């Protein structure tokens, strides 16, 4: 029986209307697979990390018989109640978006061994959790190369969100890619903060980018969630370049986004939902890198005029060399 507590939680998150009974909810679901997503505090409209997960889920909804509900907590303290609300109602697949949800999701998954869970950007050692991990350092190496080939000042920049090992992986790959092209290039580095709020502070992101542009950087790679939108604003203001992250963000500020380091979170989320619907869910660690199109750089109508073909050719060759093991990119989280 669906408890009054969990119903109250679902209502508080706006998942269902107050007039909707559990019988109504069961009728709506029918034989459909119930999928719940708990985003991080950046929300699904961040045009980056969360948005990519949402795109993948929406694509799955179009193709498969699922009921899809989501929660945008807005505050870290709301994450656990949201996960538990989905679990108490018996959602078949519950996704936690972002490494910060790892400890909570691990405990919730243990309490509900009959359900399946997805954790993005962290590893939960539980057989009913699919942990989706990306080789961000590989994709960051490629955009670092593009930044260096574009650079005219001898300085480029990096603005990270929360100062944590996961984002160091982006930074290190970017630095190594840039120095693969220009060994003496200087990389200016700043982080928005050390708490979860660092992902949702565009004003601080813009402030840091302004400083880097003032100090001579002409390309800045942001790996900062919603805070990265402030970096884009600075790029437009200074008429310099920025590099997007997670999703293809080239369209956000056309002409000022040099490229984007894409994590195919959309593809990964779609795939795990597909597996759940087809009865093929597999727990454990799922790794996405260049070799399986899990990461890449974005090239489209918005940025093709910004990158010469000879640069694209060199980056494509480097991609092949990374896949073949001829170029080894440091994984900052493996140190």
Language model region names:
Residues 23-335:
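A residue-level marker of the well-folded mature domains of exported/periplasmic proteins
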Residues 1-7:
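Bacterial N-terminal signal peptides that target proteins for export
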Residues 16-19:
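C-terminal motif of bacterial Sec signal peptides marking the signal peptidase cleavage site
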